[in-house]
Design a protein with these regions (language model features):
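Mid-protein regulatory/catalytic core that forms ligand/cofactor-binding pockets
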Residues: 1-70
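Amphipathic alpha-helical interface segments
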Residues: 68-70, 74-78
């Protein structure tokens, strides 16, 4: 399957997290806090045009707003 950056997804798109670009400890801890770990399903609910942040749903449960910096460092497979 083709891997895509979360930042390239549009509202309604779904994917499973398969890789991270930034492997710094603070970034990985932040992802863990949000429940965004490898194998996690996410769906893009909305894209904020002002700053390209994304509203996402994680594992059909919780909703989060993630910055463009976060979405540029996460890869998903459909």
């Amino acid at each position: 399957p083709q891997h895509r950056l979360v930042s390239d997804l549009r509202p309604g798109d779904k994917g499973t997290i398969v890789a991270v670009k930034n492997t710094s400890v603070p970034f990985l801890q932040y992802l863990d806090k949000l429940g965004l770990t490898l194998g996690t399903r996410l769906e893009v609910l909305d894209k904020i045009l002002f700053d390209n942040s994304l509203e996402i749903k994680v594992n059909e449960l919780s909703k989060h707003l993630i910055s463009v910096e976060v979405s540029r460092n996460l890869y998903v497979a459909e």
